[in-house]
Amino acid sequence: MQTKTLIIGNGEIGKSLFEVLDSVYECFIRGKDNTKEHFDIIHICFPYGDDFVEEVKRYQKLYTPTNTVIHSTVPVGISRKCGATHSPVRGLHPNLARSLCNFIKFVGGSDEVADYFRHAGMRVYLCRKPETTELLKLNSTETYRREIKAVQQLEKVCQKYGVPFAEVYTIATQTYNEGYSKMGYSEYHRPLLQPLQKTIDGHCVEPNHEIIEKNKIMEL
């Protein structure tokens, strides 16, 4: 399959995507010296910002792709405004190339893009709407954020009462999960996290929370 591919964004996501796709497709990462030419598919891998839609449309006009895939975390509805497919990246920083090959790759809105990723060796789950995958990613990082904050708070409460955090939370959660596994109900497992000794910085957790808050994503 000869699909001329351009990745726009040279951070961890862009570099990792290139590592996976380059062995299958004619693949480039956009640099300052890129000239105006046609690419069959462009991958948007730069962070969301106020001018995100305008930037995506500028690249679409410049490179005239048949398909545009947004891998960035964006507010619900942005991919549709761009006429793009959405496909969030999940996994462990900085080893995202390995994560791309091991996690199911959700694709929102395009059978053709789903087949493109399958041809590159990825396991794909196709959602009919890009809004589905946009909300999926926001919910994923927001859930992780809430769980981390809850564990941080519990550690402080344990210190207040002079009781061991390991017993109140770690061992209790481990044995809770073991019990449900033995009973055949692993779907009731609870996450087992360690309290961070600093603020939640990360690559995406707090920026994604800001997207949710600013755009009132979770409000009814």
Locate each region found by the language model.
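Interdomain hinge/lid region at the active-site interface
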Residues: E134, R145, K149-L220
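Conserved beta-strand termini and adjacent loop/short-helix elements that scaffold enzyme active sites
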Residues: N10, F28-D33, T85-V89, C127-P130, ...
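Gly/Ser/Thr-rich loops at beta-strand to alpha-helix junctions
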Residues: G11-I13, T73-I78, Y144
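Rossmann-like NAD(P)-binding element
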Residues: G31-N67
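Rossmann-fold dinucleotide-binding core
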Residues: E55, N67-L136, I212
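Short, well-ordered alpha-helices that flank and scaffold nucleotide-derived cofactor binding pockets
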Residues: E19-S23, K61, K214
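Short, hydrophobic beta-strand segments that form beta-sheet elements in well-ordered domains
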Residues: T5-I7, S23-K32, P65-S72, I104-G109
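NAD(P)+-binding Rossmann beta1-loop-alpha1 motif at the extreme N-terminus of oxidoreductases
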Residues: M1-I41
